[in-house]
Amino acid sequence: MMIKDILGNYSIIGTNQNESDETYNGTLSLGLDEKNRIIAKWLINKSQEQFGVGFFKENILVINFNYVGDENNTYFGTVVYKCFTKDILEGFWSEEFGNPQFLGSENCFRIKDQKELLS
């Protein structure tokens, strides 16, 4: 798989870095910058935006991300995805103030446009 193969929009479902079994939903958009690095943008539960920059090698995608949380504090973390196909990514993540006894998880499924679905 090449880096260009994973670019696009994904529907996501994930769990947080804690003991809860609660899930979150959202979207992940992957693009490239002028230096051929992955640029990521998440929209979690239709309200929280997260941003990241990463790299791709041997079907592994690593993204360092950040977001503004409570009281305007900025939080940082890293997510690692295994790219099973260009349409399915499975990952785990951790952030600096998360519970170190847990990892968050995230599964991503490519959002196909109407044209692709008709093919």
Model-identified regions with their sequence ranges:
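Central antiparallel beta-sheet cores of small beta-barrel/beta-sandwich binding domains
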Residues: 2-119
